[in-house]
C-alpha cells in the first residue's frame, strides 16, 4: 500500500479541515487519530497506535474553501484513543468520521486493545460502532488474527486472546461453582434438625454459678457416644432447658437428628425438681361437677345465695362437688359477678338486691372453689383459658338451666302471638296469664275488684310449675311496672331459673290509637294512654328486685277459692290455656 500525503494549513479555529485521499483502501485493524497541536502550530498530524508508542504517519495540510469542489470529508472532532477519552468530552477535540488515511503496504502491528475493541467476538461488544467499510473486512481481519498468517504480532494477539478467554471461562466456572455450593448449603440447612426455641416463661435460672460454654464438636460426638454410660456429672432436667438438651456442669449439649438418645434418662440419677410458673395449670374443660339442682335446704331465704363446699383432690387438683341452691340467674350488665381469681368468703351485695355467699356466681350458677391462684389473672395465657372455660360453662348452663320468660306490653301490642311463638319452640313450656282468672265457661267477664285476687292466683300457678321444673314458664301479663314482676322473679331465682324479659316487636306497641283497634277486650284509648304513662321502658332483674309495691296496692287480699275452675283449666291442662291480654 502506497503512502498518501495531505497538505494542511492552519486557517483558524472555525475553519473546516478537508482532505483528499490518494488511496481509498483501509484496514479495519488500524486506527487513525487526528490530534490538534496545543502549541498553536499550523499543522495537524495523523498518528497510528502500534503497541505502546504513537508513530506519526502523515501530516495534514489544512486548506481553505478552494478544495470544496473535490471529494472532501469534513472532520468535526478530534478522535482520541478510546480507552483514554470518549469522543465529544472535550470542546476542542475534532472527531474524524469516515476519514480515509493511507497506510504502509506491510502488515501493521496491531495492539491488543484495538483488537478487542474492533474484532473480538468473545468480548461483550465494541464500545463504538465501527464504520461500514470496517464491517466488510471484519471477517477477513479476524481470520488473519486467529491464524497468525505471516504476522508475529497476530500470533501474540491470538495467544493473548486465548488467555483472556480462558480467564473469563475460569471466572464463570468459579461463579457457577459458588452458586452450587450455596445451593448445597441451603439444602443441607433445610434437611437439618430444627430445634424448637423455648419460650421465655420456660427458662429456669439453674445456670447460675456455672460456666455456660458450649461443647466443641469433637466433645459433642464423644458425649453422644457415651450417653448410654453412667455419667459422673449431675443430671439435671427441667422445663427451663430447650427440648432434648441436657445440662452437664453448666454446659448445654445440643441434640442431633437421632432422638433415640435424647429419650434415654438414667433412673439411678437424681432428677432436678420440676419447676413451672407459680400455680399449676387449670384443669381441663371436661372435668365433671356434681351439681344437685333444686336440692336446697327447706325454706331457704329468697334473697340469699347458698352453697355447700365439698371439695376433693383428683390428680393433684381440687375439684369441687357443688351442691348448689340455684338462687340467681341474670343477664343484666348491672349485676355483679365475683371472679375465681379472688378468694372471697364474705357476703357481697349484688346489683339485683340479693346477696351472694362465697366466691363465684355466673348466670345463677354458684361454684365454690377451694383454691384460686393469685397470679391467675396476671398470666395472659391462663387468663384466656379461664375466659374460654367460663364461657363454655355458661353456654352449657344456659342449655341446662330452666327458663322464666316475662312478657311485657300494652293491651293489643302482640303479647299473645309472641307467647305462642315461644311455646311452639319448646312444647314442654307453659303459659300463665292473669286474664285466665276472668275467663268463665260462658265467656270473659272482667271485674276490676277481683284484679288483686287474679294476680295472686296466677302467681301461685307459676310457682307450682317452677317447683315441678317446667321450662320455659311464660308469664303473659302487661307487666308495665317492675313491682308487678317481682313475685315471679323471686321464685324463679330461688330455684335457679334464668329470667328473661321479652316485648313484642310491633310498630304499634306504643300507639294508643292502633292498640285500641287491636286489643280483644275493648280497652279504651284513654285507659291505654294512662297505662303508657306508667310504662317503665328500662327493665332488668336488679330493677325488679329493688322495686317496691305501691302502698295502695299492698293491702291484704283474701286468697281465691281453691276449687274454682277457670276457662283456662287447671295446671295439668296447660295445652288448652287461652292466652289473653291483661288490663
Swiss-Prot record:
InterPro entries: NEDD4-bd_p2 (IPR026302), P-loop_NTPase (IPR027417). The keyword Transmembrane helix does not apply. The keyword Cell membrane does not apply. Gene3D superfamilies: P-loop containing nucleotide triphosphate hydrolases. GO terms for cellular component: extracellular exosome; nucleus; transcription repressor complex. This is NEDD4-binding protein 2-like 2. It comes from the Eukaryota. Residues 549-575 are annotated as: Disordered. The lineage of its organism: Eukaryota, Metazoa, Chordata, Craniata, Vertebrata. One of its GO terms (biological process) is negative regulation of transcription by RNA polymerase II. One of its GO terms (molecular function) is transcription corepressor activity. Keywords: Coiled coil. Residues 162-197 form a coiled coil.
